[in-house]
From Swiss-Prot:
Gene3D superfamilies reported for this sequence: MoaB/Mog-like domain (3.40.980.10)
Organism, scientific name: Staphylococcus epidermidis (strain ATCC 35984 / DSM 28319 / BCRC 17069 / CCUG 31568 / BM 3577 / RP62A)
InterPro entries per UniProt: MoaB, MoaB/Mog-like_dom_sf, MoaB/Mog_dom, MoCF_biosynth_CS
GO terms under biological process: Mo-molybdopterin cofactor biosynthetic process
Protein name: Molybdenum cofactor biosynthesis protein B
Classification of source organism: Bacteria, Bacillati, Bacillota, Bacilli, Bacillales
A Pfam family hit: MoCF_biosynth
Keyword tags: Molybdenum cofactor biosynthesis
Length: 176
């Protein structure tokens, strides 16, 4: 496939998404990050169904439990996006919960995200993020920081432009 063909991929079905906010302080009314992800991802050119939206505490067992529930559900998810818990404080454990579940890590996501964060958003504070992405079988997982600026950057510049292509690639041998 040539570059221009990747940009024209349109799936003949909705993209099924789950959003997980990781925070000790947010609830559904105050969770600006989770709400922003919903808003931005719904603007994707392909139809998107937000199948699940949850908030869990900054606790590795709680995060892992919720992710495993979604990953083993009979309703196949295409994408899980987490927000929060990607920094360097003792309570930031999202990466420790996500990484062991990944079949393949998309190293380029974290590299590009930190580069764009450095050049377009927070400068050298980009060093503090450990945002990652990868796959767990045929599900994409993105672990994003909790700040709305970081969420907007990741969704607009990295996730939305490649979402249909990523979902297509993960499912072409399974569903076609």
């Amino acid at each position: 496939m040539h570059k221009h063909q990747h940009q024209n991929i349109h799936l003949n079905r909705p993209i099924h998404v789950a959003i997980l906010t990781v925070s000790d302080t947010r609830d559904y009314d105050s969770d600006k990050g989770g709400q922003l992800i919903q808003s931005l991802i719904n603007q994707h050119e392909n139809h998107v169904d937000i199948n699940h939206y949850r908030i869990v505490k900054d606790d590795i067992e709680a995060i892992t439990h919720q992710l495993k529930l979604w990953l083993t559900s009979s309703n196949q998810l295409d994408v899980i996006i987490t927000t929060g818990g990607t920094g360097i404080s003792q309570r930031d454990v999202t990466i420790e919960a996500v990484r062991p579940l990944l079949t393949k890590e998309l190293e380029g996501f974290g590299e590009l995200f930190r580069y764009l964060s450095y050049t377009e958003d927070v400068g050298t504070r980009a060093l503090l993020t450990r945002a990652i992405a990868g796959t767990c079988d045929s599900t994409l997982i993105f672990a994003l920081p909790g700040s709305t600026g970081a969420i907007k950057l990741a969704i607009e510049k990295l996730i939305k432009p490649e979402l249909s292509h990523l979902v297509f690639e993960l499912n072409k041998d399974i569903r076609n």
